């Protein structure tokens, strides 16, 4: 057995053991990387290299967008914007079976698109629509399952922090192209959940809402326009070359703050608390990005990506089977690992394999984000699943049975995105971004 392989086994073993015993993901990544580096190079050199990699990994202009988008999401979550989006969603989906559940899906797509956070969408929509569903006699497990199943769509529909992280790791991948590539897969996911929610609503006897008068509908849309304009301003500005994704994220913060103050949903004195919440989340993400840069360097030094690539290509050279294997791997990884560290660790491993048979890095990025987003609604570390159940006032054990059919239809959507590249690439190509 070669020294590189021995070091690779040490790294993987330490990482797995630390994760199993419940160590924080950042600590597990850092410890396993540090030990493996000391095994390869002198301790003083490994410490110096680690410091350099941490700085280099987090010293990226595009990553500055992450704290701003997180802050914008927190401001909107506290600023009355969610209520207006829910009212708009109720008008859009009011005539469908299980109208309140359908409006939950639409609202998650709208709020997630603005905030970029699936967990924030699940909390905001569950807290707003959940009580209305309970009042109308909806089963808690049904309403929670719909909320949980649709919340991750916000990680695919731009602006998306996960896509920004992927872009920084993959290198030379346009954030604007990734943003556009996420629209159709995100809408496909949301549409699939709506279809199944409607079928289940009919079986349960949940009726459509009464027809809303045109005047009321127009008033509701008018009230939601300022909130929806945020998407138009940010995405339109990025696509039009007016500003970068990073600059757009700062504009999103200013716009969301001004809008929330106009709505009088919070006061100036609330801003420090909201900023502190965003700073905590940003600190965790940046910490993991820096430590994951050490792991990426150590893996490249030991040749782990080549080993995995050779192992997969040794099983088959059929690209369709390879994509299926990658999907299975990412679904398993997403079940046990949060989205950001999974992107940081597995992008350097899997992207070269996909490039070897001609897969576009943008298509792979969407595939990666789609797979790992599914992990956010699966135990044991599904953040959106935990958030949705807590807000919905139910338990994971009771929701899982109702959630299983949604897993099935989301997996069908995943296969469509996997094997029909144009679902991801169409908008980016039409707009000349690739």
What are these regions (language model features)?
Residues 1-434:
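Alpha-helical transmembrane segments of multi-pass membrane transport proteins
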